[in-house]
Swiss-Prot record:
This is Formate--tetrahydrofolate ligase. The gene is fhs. Its EC number is 6.3.4.3. Coiled coil: none annotated. GO terms for biological process: tetrahydrofolate interconversion. NCBIfam families: PRK13505.1. InterPro entries: Formate_THF_ligase, Formate_THF_ligase_CS, P-loop_NTPase. ATP binds at residues 68-75. It catalyses: (6S)-5,6,7,8-tetrahydrofolate + formate + ATP = (6R)-10-formyltetrahydrofolate + ADP + phosphate. SUPFAM superfamilies: P-loop containing nucleoside triphosphate hydrolases (SSF52540). Belongs to the formate--tetrahydrofolate ligase family. One of its GO terms (molecular function) is ATP binding. Pathway: One-carbon metabolism; tetrahydrofolate interconversion.
Amino acid sequence: MKSHLSDIEIAQRTELKPITEIARKLNINDEEIECFGCTKAKISLKIFERLKEKPDGQVILVTSINPTPAGEGKSTVTVGLSQALWQIGKKSIVAMREPSLGPTMGLKGGAAGGGYSQVLPMEDINLHFTGDMHAITAANNALAAFIDNHIHQGNELNIDIRKIVWKRALDLNDRALRETVVGLGGKANGFPREDGFDITVASEIMAVLCLARDLADLKKRLASMIVAYTVDGQPVTAGMLGVQGALALLLKDAIKPNLVQTVEGTPALVHGGPFANIAHGANSLIATKTAAKLADYVVTEAGFGADLGAEKFMHIKTRAGGFTPGAVVIVATVRALKMHGGTPLADLKQKDLEALKRGIANLAKHIETIDAFGLPYVVAVNRFVQDTEDELEAVLGWCRDNGHPAALCNVWEEGGKGGTDLAREVIHVMEQKDNRFSYLYELTDSIEDKLAKISRTVYGAEGVEFTEKAKKQLLELKKNGLDGLPVCVAKTQYSLSDDPGKIGRPQDFSITVRELKPSRGAGFIVALTGSILTMPGLPKHPAALKMDVDESGRAKGLF
């Protein structure tokens, strides 16, 4: 097996173009960007006024099968496909989420793509970037401080301190902060109460920023966020505290999309970063809308498999944005299919055709899901260096035999050149296949019916069960008139079910909803299932242990 440069070595050897040159490539005027050094910029929201009459480009969504813990290269395929579209003469922008420091320091070590299909400068993007994550964290924690101060100063709204639902946030994995007590140390420090932290990317403010259309919509959404309940059970919002203006002020720059570039010097918008297993899992609507005004094709991704990010993209993001995806790319890998066929994680580099063939059932279910939405699709078989020709052909052959458009993808090793077959196939299905896009549920459906339709159609479950706590919350949501919102299921990414141990295509199972939480500002109801947590913990050997910086300031260990 030939040796390859690491992701960070490729990134650091790439000569970046000035970001002003990337902007000119998209016909962005100089006064419409705000530069952060030479290689990063924010795009002014004023650009929409100039481009409002321009037709939108087509949105291509990249999703995947249920992944292994290491991921299946979906971000890499997303970047590589956008580069490949340029190589076949199509004007494209890749629109991605910003990485969270939690997974970067924890398991993943970075999330800017890989190999010769990365967004750059990857060190900046994976760490502090343009400060968006910190602004969102600050806004989240400012709101928490405003709530406690309101209570300390007399509690005019009669907030029940046992029913404060707004948590503090931190953009790191820190299990010790899941459950905390604040207000200790005497009367001067406020009222003692139970509290806790969510990771920033699970904060409702992250979702609000990513679904807002503009600053006015952002402020409206911030005002409507439910932060607590009164002693008689009435919801208390951020607007009732009168702080939506201050929160919007903290976010006035964070709402602007970030312009960067790929390894091949093609444009990229990297903005917003909600997780898909505990939030809606898509980049900001503003970035997607901006990209659609600037290019003929927008290649974007939704977190984890089609059961999580893609389902939420369809039901939440497209509804908020009023657009229809042009096509979907479903990323599949030999190693993940072998895992779903029963190969232990430690043995995934070993050839196992029988396990691979069994695991294809997982891919089949995700294809069924995208087909249920009525969208054209292509299976991207993402090649890893250890894959054998027999294994790759087994997947491609199954796709051919069953009438599923598919292409081998080698963008990690070859950049855009390794994705031109995929790019041509995607263009082909958009031009030749009918787009029959429709939702799986209507907003007028009950919460129970929305969850049942997702569970049966997307997960393959027999139905949905509710804990006693969730049943009480159902009644509260209906009483408060929130049952007309879409639902956002918080679920494990490793299985179609709510049990991460049920690999492949599980049968004879139900989804159990243990808690329902309104995110009224974001515009959806979060349904928590299984043991999913909104503040992750670090693994035994965090990726941070391999990270360093040399005397010249050069980063090491990111990938």
